[in-house]
A protein has these predicted regions:
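A detector for small-residue-rich transmembrane helices and their helix-helix packing motifs
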Residues: 1-288
Length: 288
């Protein structure tokens, strides 16, 4: 997106946006340093786990927003870019207090919806686990792995196990090993953590689209201009489609994104109704 757009030229980096960027980047660097220097990964206490996981703690609904993917820079980079581009405009429009309230509520709301969606997505796997425990076997195990284990986790050791079992299907030891593997796969999926400020960023995105629907946004790929309201609709539709696909190889929290948009929309409607009762205040207006 093109920051030379006149709407964004007015978006000075304000205090809350600046502070959030500093805190988020510092948190990401601190986690990296802890792993590299102390062999301690504090993100396992701060990332958001499903409420059915033994690793879940209530404070994670707040702290997960400041954790990001450690395997690369792009996750945190694009989130902070979105925070700066959209957040700066919104903080100027709302003021720091309302902006921070909105950012945190949409982020935590996105976390709640993400956990609920994850439970829905995992239910078929839990049913498959029970079915396998009741009737274990080579064919059933192969199907379970294909349906429930992300491709990135399927390695040579697993393939060798399947190959050996194929030629020794009467050996009960393979059944016992497969049961342990099924439970490990189930635990791995259940204990997958959610990290990132994306829920809040998508909340900012819908707020920008509703407050300034006719603002022109220049996309990077493809490089075409688009009104904010259409940009939000397209992004929301893509996230909904991707989330409903429930692809186990997709490592993106689509329902966290949708959750941020939904909570943001509800909060905007509440504020609009309340603010309409205040004389002279127009919560939905164009930037000058």
């Amino acid at each position: 997106m093109d920051s030379s757009n006149p709407y964004f030229q007015q978006a000075r980096r304000t205090s809350v946006v600046k502070s959030l960027i500093i805190i988020t980047v510092a948190s990401w660097l601190a986690v990296q340093a802890g792993i590299q220097l102390l062999q301690v990964d504090i993100s396992q206490y701060l990332a958001l786990y499903n409420y059915n996981s033994e690793k879940f703690r209530p404070w994670q609904l707040f702290t997960y927003m400041f954790m990001h993917d450690l395997s690369g820079f792009m996750h945190i980079f694009f989130n902070m870019l979105g925070l700066w581009m959209f957040g700066s405009v919104l903080e100027r429009h709302w003021g720091s207090k309302r902006f921070l309230t909105y950012y945190l509520i949409t982020g935590m709301g996105a976390g709640v919806i993400s956990m609920l969606a994850m439970t829905w997505q995992l239910n078929p796997m839990f049913e498959s686990v029970q079915a396998y425990l009741a009737n274990p076997g080579y064919v059933q195990f192969e199907r379970f792995v294909s349906d429930n284990m992300p491709g990135s986790y399927q390695n040579d050791q697993l393939n060798q196990f399947l190959k050996n079992w194929y030629y020794n299907q009467q050996n009960p030891e393979y059944v016992r090993e497969s049961v342990r593997a099924v439970m490990e796969i189930s635990d791995m999926r259940l204990n997958t953590a959610t990290v990132g400020a994306s829920g809040s960023i998508f909340g900012l995105l819908i707020a920008f689209g509703m407050l300034f629907p006719n603002a022109m946004i220049m996309l990077l790929i493809p490089p075409i201009p688009m009104r904010a309201k259409y940009f939000v609709i397209i992004f929301g539709a893509i996230e909904l489609f991707s989330g409903l696909r429930n692809n186990i190889d997709d490592n993106v929290g689509h329902f966290a994104h949708l959750g941020g948009m939904l909570v943001g929309f509800i909060l905007l409607m509440i504020w609009k109704r309340r603010d309409n009762n205040r004389s002279g205040y127009q919560p939905f207006e164009e930037l000058p």
